[in-house]
């Protein structure tokens, strides 16, 4: 079952991030979470999600852009289903070059050639002590 997110929780999430990072900040969540966030309204009944077509800008939530990440957890108890912050502070390290191996024998009887590729990567927040990215965690139940 999906856990609900309120408009006030999103406001608190935005303000939990150091103001120095909010200029380039954006949200990140699963597409199912976006569906639920599009239904949220503020105290005046205005939607938090705003389509950008009228102003030729990307769609926003609370005035911030968002990114859909299908690998993020869906809204459920205990899940960290919404991230907010400056993702340019996330560094991706390529541990090694891509290694490609050609396997002539595997599918030879079918007249085909197989390829096998290896690649290693890692990632971490730079200067994580100043909290450039925060997560909204759903209540456990």
Predicted features along the sequence, with ranges:
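Structured, hydrophobic secondary-structure cores that serve as assembly/anchoring elements
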Residues: 1-141
């Amino acid at each position: 079952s999906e856990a609900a997110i309120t408009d006030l929780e999103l406001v608190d999430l935005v303000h939990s991030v150091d103001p120095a990072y909010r200029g380039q900040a954006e949200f990140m969540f699963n597409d199912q979470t976006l569906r639920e966030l599009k239904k949220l309204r503020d105290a005046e009944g205005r939607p938090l999600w705003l389509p950008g077509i009228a102003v030729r800008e990307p769609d926003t939530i609370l005035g911030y852009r968002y990114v859909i990440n299908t690998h993020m957890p869906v809204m459920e108890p205990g899940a960290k289903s919404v991230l907010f912050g400056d993702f340019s502070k996330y560094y991706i390290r390529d541990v090694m070059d891509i290694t490609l191996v050609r396997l002539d024998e595997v599918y030879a009887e079918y007249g085909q050639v197989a390829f096998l590729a290896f690649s290693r990567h890692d990632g971490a927040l730079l200067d994580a002590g100043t909290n450039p990215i925060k997560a909204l965690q759903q209540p456990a139940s």
